[in-house]
Amino acid sequence: MRSLRFLTLLTAILAAPALAHHGWGWTDGGEFTLTGTVAAADLGNPHGVLTMTVNDETWTVEVGQPWRNAQAGLTDAMLAPGAELTVEGHRSADPAQFLMKAERLVIDSQSYNLYPDRS
């Protein structure tokens, strides 16, 4: 019984960072806009990630889950290295992190809304 409690506690401790990260709680809650150039993109699971160059800084931008990206109309080809885009969403609450969660991407004047229910 004691080892079962220990395993349950250990599982909860190890899962906490992942649960805290997914969702919006790690952001500062304010609106944030970032315009730059795609250095790399991965629209895979558990959620897509863009690496962008903005004024000589490297930013990590979390986009939606694969189904959400597809529903918004995003494709890998749109996010090829060198593509310029604007991302609207929320940045990390830690200002030392160049990290944000995207709600919308604007590519060639076309808006791709990942979270239409949050608008």
Identify the residue ranges that each predicted region occupies.
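Positively charged n-region of N-terminal signal peptides that target proteins for export
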Residues: 1-5
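Bacterial N-terminal signal peptides
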Residues: 7-17
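Short boundary/loop segments of OB/S1/cold-shock single-stranded nucleic-acid-binding domains
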Residues: 18-32
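Conserved hydrophobic positions within beta-strands
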Residues: 36-38
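Short aromatic-glycine-enriched beta-strand elements
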Residues: 44-53
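A short macromolecule-binding patch
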Residues: 57-66
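Short nucleic-acid-contacting surface segments enriched for D/E, G, S/T with interspersed K/R
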Residues: 71-87
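OB-fold/S1-family single-stranded nucleic acid-binding modules
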Residues: 92-116
